[in-house]
Amino acid sequence: MVTRIISANTSEILKMDGTQLKQSIKASEGRTVLSENVVTEPAIDNLTTSEIAAAFGADLILLNLFDTLNPKVSGLEVDKPENTVKKLQKLTGRPIGVNLEPVDEKAEMESTKLQISSGRTANVESMRAAEELGFNFVCFTGNPGTGVTNRMIAKAVKTAKKNFSGLIIAGKMHGAGVDEPVASEESVKEFLDAGADVILVPAVGTVPGFTSEELINIVKIVHKHGGLVMSTIGTSQE
């Protein structure tokens, strides 16, 4: 058996594989906190946002806008770029994950589409790079205006099962500029069937029309299939 992530020390946490990390989170019974950190600007010179988040109690750190093919975290000095994630794990004592965005070139956009680098996009190369860098988990989601769809998230999960050994999180915090439901029972089932470990959904009240009833129904579906649910605030209400 594994130690709860809220009780585990650094050496225990960083030894966990994807399956063990999932069980460690499950055993913590809803008290696990993940902090998403933008890596392009440090909060303070020579100090990463991840270190600050860990100091304030984050159990998991998720890097946003991180390019897996050009690894760099502002505020972090490393001898070699390939050691970026390992050093951040050592400094924070936390599992480190990365956002990869399953962009849909055919998406019906509600706003101007933003172009992102290949190292931020969900593809075989970026997933293998995430594996080589030592990330503990990946999160398939979309930043505003990137054109990420639930259809492509499900496809990315299937690809990740063949190219990444860590925990897999899947879902949208907001629309990512696309005209489709942010979270639905149908898309959740697709993510689970594809092999997702954790389903990401928006917190109630953070996006228009996502209700408590919908969240409860999704949680029941995910738990029935042995998965976990992460309720997120990714739209600045925090």
Regions found by a protein language model. Give the residues of each.
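Hydrophobic faces of well-ordered beta-strands that scaffold small-molecule active sites
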Residues: 31-37, 61-63, 94-102, 138-140, ...
